[in-house]
Amino acid sequence: LGIDYCCGGETLLGEACARRGLTIDAVLRALEDSDHAYSTAEQIDWTEESLTRLTDHIVTRHHTYLRDVLPGLGNLMENILAKHPEAYPGLTALRDMYVAMWDELCGHMMKEEVVLFPFIRAMESAERSDGVSANEFPCGSVLAPIHVMQEEHREAADSLSEMRKLTDGFRSPRDACNSYRVLMAGLREMEADLHLHIHLENNILFPRAVRLETSLRQPIAAQHSQRAAQHCAAFGGGP
């Protein structure tokens, strides 16, 4: 349908449909058909699961997938260019865009796994222990790394959009070789997985992490206010 639900997940359905020239009823029917295509086991409500489980799922399902598939598709492009350098005029530009996105995604996933996801898990652990202090947040607000990740998501989505345009929607010409057809199918699959990956983070994980941090910081702010009041009282001042 071409609706951007990963980086554009906050857009109202009516507005998104209008941009694509679609009716809401047609989109809802397509969503219902899509739901039937998934097994019950895959229909997990990630708005209800723990943030720890969600971050684990993103790493084991989506990060692992990208690390497995990105090198293979890159090698396939190089092989096609070596064997058929003149057959696919846009393939060199596609390869260059793909390699740049691949490099950015590798760094992006590492930052999530080393910095952001442990931060989110630590906040959830602090919530369970019910013993939060200002020392629980030595890296500042979770908003800082989230904003960086969101910008990098936008860049990845833009790269996918450009690659889709360059390949006419990841379509193969009638006379395309089997390797090129496999490449287009692989890019379509990778695009779908990355869109879902970004959706889980932008529209579920990140907003929930921000709300969790806000709830944890409220008692910390109250403690600071109480200490300030006690300090003023000790010196005979008002609050």
Can you say where each PLM-predicted feature lies in the sequence?
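Small-residue-biased structural context
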Residues: 1-239
